[in-house]
Amino acid sequence: HYKLAFLVPENEVHCGEVHLLNIGLSWEFESSESAVYAWMDPAIPRALYKPRPIFAHKGNFGHAQLIAGSYGMMGAAVLSARACLRSGVGKLTCLVPECGYTVLQSAVPEAMCTVNGERFIADATEVEKYDALGIGPGIGIHASHRLWLEKVLQQVSTPLVIDADALNILARHPELFSLLPPLTILTPHPKEFERLFGPVSNDFDRIGLAMESSRKYNILIVVKGHYSFIACPDGKGYFNSTGNPGMATAGSGDVLTGILTGLLAQGYPPKQAALLGVYLHGLAGDIAAAKSSPEALIAGDISNSLGEAFM
């Protein structure tokens, strides 16, 4: 296993290029060792992946809803919707403001679309009828958002993914934490993480606080970055092995939200969805970067490469 010190950004200058070598320990010995942290190599997502049955129809793969978009930020909704569909979900409905209706219907014809509000989403209703819910990409921050987010959290019993501006609303109103359904998936980048859970002085403290907060609120926390870290309320933490610097680009997180929401809607338990989704997101990014270079990679390339990642 990698040592924790090799996996945090602040130590990169001291580590150089790190390779994990086989020193001959038996698989039985390694599997018997209980460790808090795990390195997510390909064996974990392969074990989690569920092939599609031959005699299947779209109803077998769930109905997801994405609450996303606002005036000037409909691209986030489009990116998230495309990724959700590429993840294998059976049906997708997007809730967007009226200004985004034509944009979404034109850019993602495979998705259904409902509207509320004109330039931003003013309310969210009937959320309980979906198999999974993703909230946040491009919604902006407006006074009404806190009210409908609270209502959604009170009504929903289906798995949730919370990202982007929905995380910032949650950070401004920490009383909403008590309403989060068990095993909700939060996907903050490091700055969003500190707004949610408090300042940290180094990467080791961030990992520790993520583990503590995951147990405290019974949620899954995906701290995005190189070697994205998934903190689980069962006391385990996972470092992702896929991804590259080219994925540090606008919209990459919206793609991840779509993937996670789609996997949840298909019936993957939240922990499995988080691990598989983060791994696939990074692998699709690696495939895209190999084609276009990390510098030229854009978020849409990630969702377009999901097919190869599944293969």
Predicted regions and their residues:
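Small-residue (G/A/S/T)-rich helix-start motifs and N-terminal tracts that mark the onset
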Residues: K3-L160, N168-I185, P190-M311
